[in-house]
Amino acid sequence: MNDITVSDAIEAIYASLKNDNEELDAHIAALKSAMAREGVKEAAFETSRLVQPNRQGRKLMQSYFRKKGVAVAFV
């Protein structure tokens, strides 16, 4: 993976979510490596920018990211 920042990786994930989860797993892997490199423990996502911003959508996203080893918070 290239040296991508956490904020760039999160932006790529927003774009992927809007494009029917295209390459989502690759973007999650990039986010995970960026978080490890920068020492960030949790990725913060804006609820208003999610495709499905309700509780069910947030919990589904949180669960999927947890399976990939990424802790998610919503603001």
Task: Show the residue positions of the predicted features.
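Short, aromatic/basic amphipathic alpha-helical patches
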Residues: P53-K68
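Acidic, low-complexity, intrinsically disordered interaction modules
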Residues: K32-N54
